[in-house]
């Protein structure tokens, strides 16, 4: 995925630096979390699963599935 025209950090680069293990985190909370780590995105972020931990250099997730929906573009990012 390339950078948005706004010059924000690519979402996949941000996601790989975020770690969360909440079992009941909501879509909007994931979005806010990614934005707080510097993602400059205009997207809808959806999450499917019972709990997740994004790869942070030490721990690999059990379940991670983000559906990133941009206007005219969609992509599924997974870390296994």
Swiss-Prot record:
Lineage, top ranks: Bacteria, Pseudomonadati, Pseudomonadota, Alphaproteobacteria, Rickettsiales
What name is this protein filed under? Putative ankyrin repeat protein RC0877
Q: Where are the ANK repeats?
A: 6-46
The species is Rickettsia conorii (strain ATCC VR-613 / Malish 7)
Q: Out of the domains of life, which is the source?
A: Bacteria
Q: Which UniProt keywords are given for this protein, alphabetically ordered?
A: ANK repeat
């Amino acid at each position: 995925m390339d950078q948005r025209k706004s010059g924000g950090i690519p979402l996949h680069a941000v996601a790989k630096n975020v770690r969360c293990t909440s079992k009941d985190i909501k879509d909007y909370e994931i979005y806010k979390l990614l934005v707080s780590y510097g993602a400059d995105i205009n997207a809808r972020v959806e999450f499917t699963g019972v709990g997740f931990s994004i790869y942070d250099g030490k721990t690999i997730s059990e379940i991670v599935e983000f559906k990133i929906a941009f206007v005219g573009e969609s992509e599924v990012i997974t870390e296994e």
